[in-house]
Amino acid sequence: MVTFSHVSSLSHWFLLLLLLNLFLPVIFAMPESYSFNCPDGEYQSNDVCCKTCPSGTFVKAPCKIPHTQGQCEKCHPGTFTGKDNGLHDCELCSTCDKDQNMVADCSATSDRKCECQIGLYYYDPKFPESCRPCTKCPQGIPVLQECNSTANTVCSSSVSNPRNWLFLLMLIVFCI
């Protein structure tokens, strides 16, 4: 005959087993250590540190023996890696916008380099693709620096045209 104390005891065991069933998969899925760090020049693959692949290549297959290099493969055309890495794919090469000229083509080890076309400059250094038309100095104001692909025109703040001096002189006389 099952008494109330037996049922109570069984429910405690059932509850304990239920909790274990819920938390054991979470516990075993956690990495062994949150501070698992590989030395410089290596990357983590599963629980093993592997030596990085050189620039221009990517990891086709990770190492099986710790601190050795896995299988590296050369980047495919149109892709690159600019430094030693543990990437599983190379990065896609960027494209130049319609208002830019290509300065250097993409290679396995470097991205394509673009610059603004003549008459345009980079408006925002954080976004090099943002080319804007160069400013033209007002008539009679000297140019201190010509516009180029990385900087806008710099105009002098002084007036050098004799007509402008005459205008300023007349303005002063009228004010007095």
From Swiss-Prot:
It is found in: Cell membrane. The keyword Cell membrane applies. It is a lipid-anchor; GPI-anchor. PROSITE patterns: TNFR_NGFR_1, TNFR_NGFR_2. Disulfide bonds join 38-49, 50-63, 53-72, 75-90, 93-106, 96-114, 116-131, 134-147, 137-155. Residues 1-29 form the signal peptide. Residues 156-176 form a propeptide. Pfam families: TNFR_c6. One of its GO terms (cellular component) is external side of plasma membrane. Keywords: Cell membrane, Disulfide bond, Glycoprotein, GPI-anchor, Lipoprotein, Membrane, Receptor, Repeat, Signal. A lipid is attached at residue 155 (GPI-anchor amidated cysteine). TNFR-Cys repeats lie at residues 37-72, 74-114, 115-155. Coiled coil: none annotated. CDD domains: TNFRSF26 (cd15837). GO terms for biological process: negative regulation of extrinsic apoptotic signaling pathway via death domain receptors. The keyword Lipoprotein applies. Receptor for the cytotoxic ligand TRAIL. Lacks a cytoplasmic death domain and hence is not capable of inducing apoptosis. May protect cells against TRAIL mediated apoptosis through ligand competition. Cannot induce the NF-kappa-B pathway. This is Tumor necrosis factor receptor superfamily member 23. It comes from Mus musculus. The lineage of its organism: Eukaryota, Metazoa, Chordata, Craniata, Vertebrata.
